[in-house]
A protein has these predicted regions:
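Generic hydrophobic alpha-helical membrane-span motif
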Residues: 34-36, 84, 118, 126, ...
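Short, glycine-/Ser/Thr-/acidic-enriched flexible segments
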Residues: 66, 79, 174-178, 199-201, ...
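Short, acidic (Asp/Glu-rich) active-site segment that either coordinates a divalent metal cofactor
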Residues: 77, 168, 181-229, 265
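Glycine-rich phosphate/pyrophosphate-binding loop regions near the starts of catalytic domains
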Residues: 41-199, 279
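Asparagine-rich low-complexity intrinsically disordered tracts
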Residues: 1-19, 67, 335
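Short loop/turn motifs at secondary-structure junctions
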Residues: 112-114, 208, 252, 339
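Glycine-/charge-enriched secondary-structure boundary and capping motifs
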Residues: 13-25, 35, 41, 131-149, ...
Length: 358
């Protein structure tokens, strides 16, 4: 009996020394659970009445709003790219979650859809509780702004398989549109292009910016006007959900382009139609955030074409509307303090469709 106990004791000592647990492998389940406890009340504040279950289940349930007779679901997914690196350098992660939501829901609303719910994916080498809380808090804030329920997500630790202290984000949004309201793009001669002011660079062009900071040894603390460059770069992406929703009720928005990767030109090309040209006014390009764009253009030695295909050039969303609806649209946008410019016109063409700068 005593011998057996001794053997077991020795085995326990040996096993404790050589024990391989999830935690020693780099995954801290207890820390993950603490993060979930923090997320639950944040998510609950974003819940619409259509949410049918709580955070923490294996899946999330959402009832399609009753007002839709023939609902069509609309989905989008995106990330925030290397803007995360700027957040890392400045150790400020409070708004990067807003960027994540914005990148997804702004894509969603270009089809005329109403955002319904959102899920996120956060992957990191090891959970940093404060950093993760800041990120998720930003996501919840973005969901509140867009009236979109944060109904689930995933936080993954990839020990020794992901750079130390680094993370990445992905978001997934789902919305709905009435089937009869799905439009095919159809333009008329002299329709106008309305550029809605961006809050800054939004979430694109940051790989170029990081390279620029490195090569030219530009400090994020350096001033651009009255603000530091770092603060300007981290300004969260503008969410246009409320403005677009109200505009759609009052005027006919013929098409929309969310100005993201590919810059102003690259995204406008996605809504060009056969037999119509887009004629952009040169003096309206870089109308907003002039000092920032002038700095980037000079320091990186970029041509106008490269700037237009890399950055949003001051416009986060471009709409095509009839000219006779401009006054009505202006009243709505003023109500939401949304600045804008008429940046061009649509002209009928017999040649191949193109974007011209005049």
């Amino acid at each position: 009996m005593n011998y057996n106990i001794l053997i077991i004791s020795k085995l326990n000592i040996l096993s404790s020394k050589n024990k391989i647990s999830y935690k020693t492998s780099g995954v801290d389940i207890a820390l993950g659970e603490k993060l979930v406890d923090h997320i639950k009340p944040l998510a609950k504040k974003t819940f619409r009445k259509e949410v049918l279950n709580e955070i923490g289940g294996f899946s999330s349930l959402f009832d399609i709003p009753k007002k839709y007779k023939k609902p069509v679901l609309v989905s989008s997914t995106d990330g925030v790219g290397t803007k995360i690196e700027i957040a890392e350098i400045l150790d400020n992660h409070k708004t990067i979650g807003i960027d994540l939501v914005a990148m997804c829901v702004n894509d969603l609303i270009t089809s005329g859809a109403e955002p319904l719910f959102f899920l996120d994916y956060l992957v990191t080498e090891k959970i940093n509780l404060k950093k993760s809380k800041d990120i998720i808090s930003g996501i919840a804030k973005g969901c509140k702004i867009s009236n979109c329920s944060l109904i689930g997500g995933e936080t993954a630790e990839h020990p020794r398989n992901f750079p130390k202290n680094k993370y990445d984000l992905a978001g997934f949004s789902v919305g709905v549109i009435e089937k009869e309201k799905i439009k095919k793009i159809k333009y008329d001669n002299n329709d106008i292009l309305i550029g809605l002011k961006s809050s800054g660079l939004h979430s694109n062009g940051f790989s170029l910016i990081r390279e620029l900071l490195k090569r030219k040894k530009i400090k994020l603390s350096s001033k651009v006007g009255s603000k530091s460059l770092g603060k300007i770069l981290l300004e969260p992406t503008k969410i246009y959900v409320k403005e677009i929703k109200q505009l759609s009720k009052s005027i006919d928005i013929k098409s929309m382009a969310h100005i993201t990767g590919g810059g102003l030109l690259g995204n406008l090309e996605r809504i060009v139609c056969d037999n119509y040209n887009f004629e952009l006014e040169r003096n309206k390009l870089f109308f907003y955030h002039k000092k920032l764009f002038k700095l980037l253009m000079a320091k990186a030695s970029l041509s106008n074409e490269e700037m237009l295909r890399t950055f949003n050039c001051g416009y986060g969303m471009v709409l095509v509307i009839r000219e006779n609806e401009l006054k009505k649209g202006t009243r709505i946008l003023k109500k939401y303090n949304q600045s804008f410019q008429v940046i061009g016109r649509i002209k009928k063409s017999k040649d191949k469709s193109q974007i011209k700068i005049i």
